[in-house]
Amino acid sequence: MTIRLLCYVGFYFLGAGLMEADIYQTPRYLVIGTGKKITLECSQTMGHDKMYWYQQDPGMELHLIHYSYGVNSTEKGDLSSESTVSRIRTEHFPLTLESARPSHTSQYLCASSE
């Protein structure tokens, strides 16, 4: 069983549950085989220009991995990341990993602000 667990990468997301929210992440939970490409979607309905992706390992602090201050404007954050982002519309800020690995297992959080 331990060997099988090492063959999968888990992604956990902060979700709004049944509460009304203005920012959404999908999928909410994801378990995927190593080497697979994944895209984590983040969308917001508030028209905010600024959007952020954070990564948090269990028991550790949040690390900014990517941010955007508007359409076609993306920057890498504090944490060196193998992920990429795009921002072709104000309301969307997807995060993509080309090849998932066990070291990518973490909680990924999306945020936005004015």
UniProtKB/Swiss-Prot annotation:
Disulfide bond annotation, renumbered to this chain: 42-110
Keyword Cell membrane: yes
GO biological process terms held by the UniProt record: adaptive immune response; cell surface receptor signaling pathway
Domain Ig-like: 22-114
Main location: membrane
PROSITE patterns in the cross-refs: IG_LIKE
Signal sequence interval, chain numbering: 1-21
Domain of life: Eukaryota
Keywords linked to the UniProt accession: Adaptive immunity, Cell membrane, Disulfide bond, Glycoprotein, Immunity, Immunoglobulin domain, Membrane, Receptor, Signal, T cell receptor
GO cellular component: plasma membrane; T cell receptor complex
Residues modified by glycosylation: 72
Location in the cell: Cell membrane
This protein's record includes keyword Disulfide bond: yes
PANTHER family recorded: T CELL RECEPTOR BETA CHAIN MC.7.G5-RELATED, T-CELL RECEPTOR BETA CHAIN
General function of this protein: V region of the variable domain of T cell receptor (TR) beta chain that participates in the antigen recognition. Alpha-beta T cell receptors are antigen specific receptors which are essential to the immune response and are present on the cell surface of T lymphocytes. Recognize peptide-major histocompatibility (MH) (pMH) complexes that are displayed by antigen presenting cells (APC), a prerequisite for efficient T cell adaptive immunity against pathogens.
Complex and partners: Alpha-beta TR is a heterodimer composed of an alpha and beta chain; disulfide-linked. The alpha-beta TR is associated with the transmembrane signaling CD3 coreceptor proteins to form the TR-CD3 (TcR or TCR). The assembly of alpha-beta TR heterodimers with CD3 occurs in the endoplasmic reticulum where a single alpha-beta TR heterodimer associates with one CD3D-CD3E heterodimer, one CD3G-CD3E heterodimer and one CD247 homodimer forming a stable octameric structure. CD3D-CD3E and CD3G-CD3E heterodimers preferentially associate with TR alpha and TR beta chains, respectively.
Protein name (Swiss-Prot/TrEMBL): T cell receptor beta variable 25-1
Organism the protein comes from: Homo sapiens (Human)
Taxonomic lineage of the native organism: Eukaryota, Metazoa, Chordata, Craniata, Vertebrata
Gene: TRBV25-1
